[in-house]
């Protein structure tokens, strides 16, 4: 997961002298921790939520602002990937798609504890 830190002068004069920075935020090289994530969203509590797209069991994986990873959910239906994740505007429901059979789940919190 890459993180972009904008310049204090983003899109204004002075940006070239003090540009934003793209940095590697988290790179877990252990497929037991997270595998082939290709969708993400920001949770109401500030963590990232990643969707796995691996060859076996699929998870929703949380990433805290300091880079710690945790399992948030698991596809117990089949081994199809999660494809897209987002929270409702009020932050009470998480919506996530399972690619096959092409369904969307609405999952209610409570989410206040985060990871």
PLM feature spans:
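Sequence/structural signature of beta-propeller domains
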Residues: 1-115
